[in-house]
């Protein structure tokens, strides 16, 4: 159980925020909130609430339920605790987009980096409302790309390490 260590980190974050001249509006966790044990979400949230500001969350592969029926059902624990797996919000003049690019393929721990068509359509609509010149921050768990060699050759052995359909995503 890593909650005692998390408690320590949360206290450090709270101390830093109190001592800072900056105005921290929220924190952003980029996934793997808990290590497969979704029953500790409530305790995790209680600890993190001591930081003095709200957190927004991105779903990670460890936040999904494996051995389930489908990709859609793999997200239920996360959605029941935190809400939708993809959403957007504005803070000041910045538009934040959170996406789920963990695509669980219905077998063991196997997932790929992939953004499904529903999210791509939603993303197109969301971006259509944003005035040109607005700063946009996109957050997702799996990197869109790792390095030049990744861009040159698609490798089945590392499909869980980067976004498989990044060309479609980059066109957005």
Residue ranges: model-predicted function:
Residues 35-36, 64-65, 144-147:
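Short, active-site-adjacent cap segments at secondary-structure transitions
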Residues 39, 148-151:
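A short acidic (Asp/Glu
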Residues 1, 31-33, 61-62, 101-102, ...:
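Active-site metal-binding loops of divalent metal-dependent hydrolases
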Residues 20-21, 98-100, 145-147:
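Short amphipathic alpha-helical segments, especially helix-boundary/capping motifs
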Residues 30, 130-149:
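Short acidic, glycine-rich surface-loop motifs adjacent to enzyme active sites
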Residues 38-135, 155-172:
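Extended active-site neighborhood of metal-dependent phosphoesterases/phosphodiesterases
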Residues 1-42:
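N-terminal active-site segment of His-dependent metallophosphoesterases
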């Amino acid at each position: 159980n890593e909650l005692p260590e998390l408690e320590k980190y949360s206290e450090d974050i709270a101390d830093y925020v109190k001592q800072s001249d900056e105005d921290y509006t929220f924190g952003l966790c980029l996934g793997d909130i808990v290590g497969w044990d979704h029953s500790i979400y409530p305790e995790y949230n209680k600890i993190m609430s001591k930081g003095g500001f709200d957190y927004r969350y991105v779903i990670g592969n460890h936040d999904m339920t494996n051995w389930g029926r489908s990709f859609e059902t793999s997200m239920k624990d996360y959605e029941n605790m935190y809400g939708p797996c993809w959403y957007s919000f504005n803070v000041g003049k910045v538009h934040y987009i959170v996406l789920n690019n963990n695509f669980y393929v219905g077998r063991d721990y196997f997932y790929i980096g992939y953004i499904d068509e529903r999210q791509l359509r939603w993303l197109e609509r969301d971006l259509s409302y944003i005035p040109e010149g607005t700063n946009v921050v996109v957050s997702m768990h799996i990197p869109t790309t790792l390095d030049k060699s990744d861009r040159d050759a698609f490798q089945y052995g590392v499909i869980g390490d980067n976004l498989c359909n990044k060309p479609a995503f980059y066109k957005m």
